[in-house]
Amino acid sequence: MNNEMMSIIFASDNETKLNELTIHRTTASLPFCGRYRFIDFTLSNLVNSNITTIGIVTRSNYSSLTDHLRMGRDWDLNRKNSGIAIFSPYSSNTSRSMFKGKIEAMYGILDYMERASEEYVIVTNSNIASNIDFEDVYSQHVSNGADITMLTYTSHPTSSKRVIVDK
């Protein structure tokens, strides 16, 4: 278990771009290859990097997400200490309205992050289909003495009539 890192996952990112698909569910719970959901990639990356304290920030239509997660049983995250914590859009003690952005949402769960024993926080979205070793990212972050480390990728636009294949 990595006692230095925890994660905050935003489950409702890009919903305005996926209107028809996210009318009744969050981006995180969109099906992928039938059995899986987009959040499975992110959770698997975190668990494979030995990160077991994970907060999931939701915005709306998250019942299918909670049904799928089952409090993290499939990732061995259903535990008394650490594990998965799901935050509704009204989690803040200081506001009675829904958060407007990620910073405001994180401020709303600041007490959760301060109570955690981990020093570093990975902030990620749930709609990323990737394979990331966060232990390597952490090692680079610490060895460089960085305050913030950001992972990015380059997207290559394609026309709708062709597909790019890695060689």
Cite the ranges covered by each PLM segment.
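Unchanged
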Residues: 1-167
